[in-house]
A protein has these predicted regions:
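Active-site-adjacent "subsite" loops/lids of carbohydrate-active enzymes
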Residues: 71, 87, 91-147, 197
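Loop/turn elements at helix/coil->beta-strand transitions in domains of secreted/extracellular proteins
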Residues: 2-7, 37-42, 79-86, 147-151, ...
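Aromatic- and acidic-residue-enriched segments that line the glycan-binding/catalytic groove
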Residues: 54-66, 91-119, 155-180, 227
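The substrate-binding groove and active-site-proximal loops of carbohydrate-active enzymes
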Residues: 9-25, 53-69, 117-139, 177-192, ...
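Short, solvent-exposed turn/loop segments enriched in Gly/Ser/Thr/Pro and often Arg
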Residues: 11-13, 43-51, 89-96, 153-164, ...
Length: 316
């Protein structure tokens, strides 16, 4: 099993319609830039929250216009540079399948599948007590069989209460009340945990596994390590240290996942000053955990030079 010292987490959630998608991407240059920035591990997107796959898949939906195996090329070139790669799958969000299969979405108490802030990401969430569960298990299984990945990273494991028939029937089977809000919430939580154990069963023993969204205690015995996601520009600088202190009691390794953004995910124009990113790195080191920088890959060009010069400065 690989160990992580300095990592990068690549977010990549890309709407259709980008006509020059991947035109300037070169996987060898990508891996060499990571190596030059002293990176030894990355979380690399196999399926994003829009619902697109970035590899040839018999299960999912490839990004429209993607003409090459983006994930596979990155994996090969990173391995040549000694960099480990986990395959990233967004679980809670899949807007393409939600569009095609409304019956795979969480149904709220008012009978809606679209609710909340329509301008944000979580205006509809996928239900793992639907056909979506097997869909995702099949796609994850496809990747771990097809590629020599070093791990799997599951994201957006959201325990959104679902009042659909499948969840109601499951609650009744467990002698609960499908109209009782705490029972519905507990069903959603247990469904996530059970699904993650199913994914764990697809993986070799030496593979890293992070179910991001489960609590630290829920990950014990399941996860290879815990990643403490904290973008302090928005979340606050007191969030990480409290979680790190608790993580030290779990007897599994931990990683501090900050971001290169001034604010939070999606702050595409934001690049932290060296002192700010350096503070996060020292925060990780002083708490005895590994260090990871969250980034978002440019859909045409790949890694941005300024970002990785900054990461290189801090990791040096």
């Amino acid at each position: 099993m690989r160990t992580i010292k300095r990592a990068v987490h690549l977010d990549f959630h890309t709407l259709p319609g980008i006509y020059d998608f991947g035109d300037n991407f070169n996987a060898a240059d990508f891996a060499k830039r990571l190596k030059a920035s002293h990176i030894d591990y990355i979380n690399m997107f196999a399926k994003c929250n829009i619902g697109y796959a970035y590899f040839p898949t018999d299960v999912g939906i490839v990004y429209p216009g993607l003409s090459f195996d983006l994930f596979g090329q990155v994996l090969d070139e990173c391995h040549k540079e000694g960099i480990g790669v986990s395959a990233y799958f967004n679980i809670g969000l899949d807007h393409e399948m939600a569009r095609k299969r409304r019956d795979w979405c969480v149904l709220n108490k008012e009978g809606q599948v679209i609710f909340g802030d329509r301008t944000a990401n979580f205006f509809r969430v996928m239900c793992l007590n639907s056909g979506y569960r097997e869909y995702m298990l099949s796609m994850i299984g496809e990747v771990v069989k097809k590629y020599p990945v070093d791990g799997v990273f599951l994201d957006c494991l959201v325990a959104e209460p679902c009042y659909g028939d499948e969840c109601a029937e499951l609650i009744v089977q467990n002698e609960g009340d499908p109209l009782d809000d705490p029972s519905v919430g507990q069903c959603a939580r247990q469904t996530l945990i059970d699904f993650c154990w199913e994914v764990k069963g697809l993986l070799d023993d030496d593979m890293l596994f992070v179910p991001n969204g489960l609590s630290h205690t829920e990950r014990v015995g399941m996860a290879s390590h815990t990643e403490i996601e904290c973008l302090p520009g928005e979340w606050g600088y007191d969030y990480f240290s409290a979680h790190a202190a608790f993580a030290r009691t779990l007897a599994i390794p931990a990683v501090y996942m900050t971001g290169r953004f001034h604010a939070s995910w999606g702050d595409f124009g934001g690049l932290k000053q060296k002192a700010s990113l350096e503070y996060d790195a020292w925060d990780a080191v002083s708490n005895g955990v590994a260090f990871s920088v969250g980034d978002h890959l440019h859909p045409r060009d790949g890694l941005e030079t300024a970002t990785y010069e900054r990461v290189k400065e801090v990791n040096r």
